Regions:
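N-terminal intrinsically disordered/low-complexity leader segments
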Residues: 1-22
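Helix-turn-helix
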Residues: 26, 30, 34-68, 72
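Solvent-exposed, amphipathic alpha-helical segments
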Residues: 30-37, 84-88, 119, 123, ...
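Anionic, Ser/Thr-rich low-complexity intrinsically disordered regions
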Residues: 35-38, 58, 140-148, 177
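Hydrophobic alpha-helical connector segments
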Residues: 75, 86-116, 167-171, 194
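Short, basic, alpha-helical segments at the C-terminal edge of helix-turn-helix-like DNA-binding modules
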Residues: 75-81
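Amphipathic alpha-helical segments used for helix-helix packing
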Residues: 112-135
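Hydrophobic/aromatic-rich alpha-helical bundle segments in the mid-to-C-terminal region
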Residues: 132-138, 142, 155-208
């Protein structure tokens, strides 16, 4: 994933709210690769600042602590992920294009963005111990489940009768495969993305009546 570039982020007064919001977004996306390398347990804002090439003061200006930085960055990245896959779903002209497109998209995500996506599972695990992560997890999971609402709606529009009509069940199923093959990819299994692609296509076949 291409990271946003930050030429200069000044510690200006908080009177220009729209500008501050955009700078906060740029900073979080710029720091995302560093967060992905470290994970929540090992990260601290000083390390993130050094790895990202921005001052610690700038990070503290926009984020109170590492929890806020991590959750904000994960939500931003997942927003783009959800937007892209839902665009693909809505544009599919037929069931074969839909299943192939979704399978390719998810497999390519595992191949190219595994480190960033593991941050989501890191955040989800932290939410079991720290209430500060609850809002982030609820927001992201709602958006992820909505992908499967869009998928089932599209299949119905294309005339496909499905055995499963509960988007939550489909989310849990595909998310389980996603996490498994993501872990295999991170362990160095070069075949993981293609194996995931095959598994998603199999699930599509099982889904149709």
């Amino acid at each position: 994933m291409e990271q946003a570039s930050i030429d200069v982020i000044e510690e200006a007064p908080r009177k220009a709210a729209p500008r501050n919001t955009e700078k906060k977004r740029e900073l979080a996306l710029h720091a995302l690769s560093s967060l992905a390398e470290l994970g929540f347990a090992r990260m601290n804002l000083r390390d993130v600042a050094q790895r990202s090439g921005v001052s610690l003061g700038v990070i503290h200006y926009y984020f109170e602590n590492k929890t806020e930085l991590l959750t904000y960055g994960v939500v931003l990245y997942k927003e783009d992920f959800v937007k892209d896959i839902k665009t693909l779903i809505r544009a599919a002209p037929d069931p074969a294009t839909l299943s192939g497109g979704v399978a390719d998209f998810l497999a390519n995500t595992v191949a190219q963005d595994a480190q960033v996506h593991r941050l989501w599972y890191d955040v989800r695990a932290q939410a079991q111990f720290d209430a500060a992560f609850h809002a982030c997890v609820a927001e992201v999971e709602h958006a992820l489940i909505d992908i499967f609402v869009a998928l089932l709606t599209k299949l119905q529009t294309l005339g496909v009768k499905c055995r499963e009509t509960d988007p939550l069940r489909l989310y849990i199923l595909i998310d389980g495969w996603f996490r498994y093959f993501l872990q295999q990819q991170l362990k160095g299994d070069v075949d993981a993305p293609n194996a995931f692609r095959i598994k998603v296509l199999e699930e599509f076949k099982l889904l149709a009546v």
